[in-house]
């Protein structure tokens, strides 16, 4: 699988847990590129920036 994981929005892909995808917007890939976002974060965008603590980031307050 391409590590950039550039799949279409709403499509389907197989992002692994170690995927460092930057453009993945497919519905089947629940993992974002920001490891500090909580699993249920609806606002979480690809490439959001973590702020210090592992549970805080720029897109999930």
From Swiss-Prot:
Positions where Phosphoserine occurs in the chain: 58
UniProt region (Alpha), positions on chain: 30-61
Highest taxon of source: Eukaryota
Keyword Metal-binding included in the entry's annotation: yes
GO molecular function: metal ion binding; zinc ion binding
Keywords assigned: Acetylation, Cadmium, Copper, Metal-binding, Metal-thiolate cluster, Phosphoprotein, Zinc
Residues with the N-acetylmethionine modification: 1
InterPro entries referenced in this protein's UniProt entry, alphabetically: Metalthion_dom_sf, Metalthion_dom_sf_vert, Metalthion_vert, Metalthion_vert_metal_BS
Record: residues binding a divalent metal cation 3: 15, 19, 24, 29
Residues reported in the UniProt entry to bind a divalent metal cation 1: 5, 7, 21, 24
Renumbered residue ranges of the record's region Beta: 1-29
Binding site for a divalent metal cation 6: 37, 41, 44, 60
Binding site for a divalent metal cation 5: 34, 36-37, 50
GO cellular component, one term: nucleus
Residues noted as binding a divalent metal cation 2 in the record, renumbered to the chain: 7, 13, 15, 26
Gene Ontology biological-process entries: cellular response to cadmium ion; cellular response to copper ion; cellular response to zinc ion; detoxification of copper ion; intracellular zinc ion homeostasis; negative regulation of growth
Signal sequence region: none
Residues holding a divalent metal cation 4: 33-34, 44, 48
Residues given in the record as a divalent metal cation 7 binding sites: 50, 57, 59-60
UniProt xrefs under Gene3D superfamilies: Metallothionein Isoform II
Family: Belongs to the metallothionein superfamily. Type 1 family.
Entry function: Metallothioneins have a high content of cysteine residues that bind various heavy metals; these proteins are transcriptionally regulated by both heavy metals and glucocorticoids.
Domain notes: Class I metallothioneins contain 2 metal-binding domains: four divalent ions are chelated within cluster A of the alpha domain and are coordinated via cysteinyl thiolate bridges to 11 cysteine ligands. Cluster B, the corresponding region within the beta domain, can ligate three divalent ions to 9 cysteines.
Binding partners and assembly: Monomer.
Protein name (database record): Metallothionein-1H
Organism of this sequence: Homo sapiens (Human)
